Amino acid sequence: MTVGFPPAEGHGAATGRRALRRSGGGWAFVVGLLCAALAFAVLQPGTAAAQTASFANTKMPKADPNKKMLVTADELVYDYEHDKISAVGNVQIYYDGSTLEAKRVTFDRKANTLRAEGDVLLKQPDGKILTANTMQLTEDFRDGFLESLRVDTPDKTHFAATRADRTDGNITVFQNGVYTACEPCKDHPEKPVLWQIKAARIIHNQNEQMIYYKDATLEFFGLPFAYFPYFSSPDPTVKRKTGFLMPEFYNNSMLGIGAGVPFFWNIAPDRDLTFDPLYFSKQGLLAKGEWRQRLIDGSYNIRAAGIQQQDIEQFAGLPGYRENRGMVQSSGNFVINSQWQWGWDGTLTSDRTFLRDYGLIGAAETEKISQAYLTGQGDRSFFDVRGMYFLGLSVTDNQDLIPVVGTFNYNYVFGNPIFGGEAGVKVNFNSVSRTEADFVGTSAATSWVGGATGIPPGSCLLSNPNPTQCLLRGAPGDYQRLSGEFYWKKTLTDAAGQMWTPFASARVDVAHANISALPTNYTDGPTLAGQNVLQSGNDDLIRAMPVIGLDYRYPFISVENWGTQTIEPRAQLIIRPNETSIGKFPNEDAQSLVFDDANLFSVSKYSGWDRVEGGSRLNVGVTYTAALNGAGVISAVVGQSYSLFGKNSFAYGDMANTGLESGLETSTSDYVARFSYSPTNNLEFISRFRFDEENYTLQRLELEGRTSIDRLSLSATYGRYEPQPLLGYYQEREGVLTTASYKLTDVWSVSGGIRYNIAQASIDMTTAAITYADDCFTLALTYLSDYSINGPNNGPNNTVMLTIGLRTLGETKVKSAIGSSTQ
């Protein structure tokens, strides 16, 4: 049944009150609204019609079609005497995206107000849900007051108050208000939530998107924790808002106790500024801040910090022994188009330990890389060019030994097959500049054990290095190299299932080396077998390396009742000439040679472009894989490499002795193997081995295991490596790294890790943490002790950090250095 409103006065006035009732399952009526009306339109005198969904024979403005209203109720009551209309029983009003539910809703046509009573619920278009005992609102829902109110937002924040008043469609004042971002306990909703803020008044300014609290108390589990006469925070819908952030606290023996309150300035939607001053009781005010801006094609930021230290004696004998200290950092990334982007990342400091001393970097950071870059990514190509400056952050770093580097890399795979196979090109350019030679000792007597000056003692002093006791990690002077390689390969499978992959490549390297004067006792002194000592002076270099080869694989597959197994023997024959100019090309990027199963079948096993493998070689091995029904997967690899004829590149060291003592320097290499077993998706064991080819003694061993069982996660890594004095490892290295985490409950977890140096019988890294995290609150206490930052003679770097986060309000950190200094 569709019903229209009767006139406010007229021939029906003899009956002061009339009720229309129904006995069926519900009725609905739709009425047109005036542009600003909320509930019911005010009718002009006339006769009401009941045949249509809109008013007829009335004089009223045209209703906004976007603000129609649907009302359902058990009964509609007209009060002509007081000019009121009431909907009674299971009332539901749908208007402009909002839904109002109540036991009774009364519209006062004179005052243009609406009063809802009894289990009132208002759902707003933005997802907010308001509940109250009573609501009195203006006709457009803009203003009004509510009693015994509760507001639930879509992002699970909640307000409650004994009364709330809304004015100007903007400001809502909650009397005796409560705010929380925590959900009540499902089983015991009567229990206090984890945290909540109670205030005499909570004021929400919707236009400012701010919430103001007056006479506020922060409670945890219903118990008062902190009192604030006044504070404010952005409302939960705001991601960026001008105002103060959560405070920060520090404690450090050299700096004293530190505290600060950052201020965030939301200048515009595309830019902001954070001013974050910290005052330290021993050193004074550290001024720091960050500017961020997003442009149409990217974004950038600038960070700066500076301090005039009040007590420089705390840093006596250290890089921080100066009055004025500071830094500037900046990074940016910009998109040129869908394939190209460019950017930078730069750091400039007054001294190398400023960032660590004042907690401006992570505990494990040992260097900062300043770089500018341009990269491109296509369907079959990759382009990258960048310049890099490495800033050492340790007390023992000598910046003159650290290079400035420029690199260029380009890879392209041809779209159309060439002779039926895949072909492509690789290009690399590298430029290295260094002020002083970087010598490293090959024994305990000549090794650099650290020190404030950063100059190695003993036989590896820059003025008197002995090539039989020292190797050159970095060449002084300037070095540029351009390399290009063309490659081709094609895989053929015959009727028997054998896989044949012929391949070929051609590479050319051209370089210019301007090596600063090296000590004559290094360049002219006695050398070890296989050493090729770098010489001083200018040199233009060129070398070429053509390669042809054949890769053969023959997989055998067996399907059994217990599972499926695959055995695949593999052989790789490589024919090429000898490597030329060994030792004349400074080796800057190919020093990290580790011979294992990962590079057993690599055509060139060097890690970079400064060395190229020469001489003909045969690589052989067998791979075994078994998928056990219900019992996991086993995988194993074993292999060996043979130098067939020509010069074995790995038997000839360069300035860093790369290749010597690698297991590849003899005509028959060491054996390499890998074995792994995964009984389930949550449990895995991996082992890697290298055995001497003559006596089968273990040269290199790595064992790793990791598992995740319900709430428990464990991992352990064990490594043992025989001495390689010609590479600077003059002692046996052996250690264990273990990590564990356990989820005590859905919200509580603990984690920790230990690195134990077996060779030195000492723990050199320890970490532990306990964390609480739920839907509204985070608490983390973390401890880290690490010797690797300061060096073994300077003691560990011990740090404790407490992090507390209240969802929607922010996060604060308390960081303290304990024990030895943070140097």
Where do the protein language model's features map onto the residues?
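N-terminal targeting/secretion presequences
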Residues: 2-7, 11, 19-20, 42-59, ...
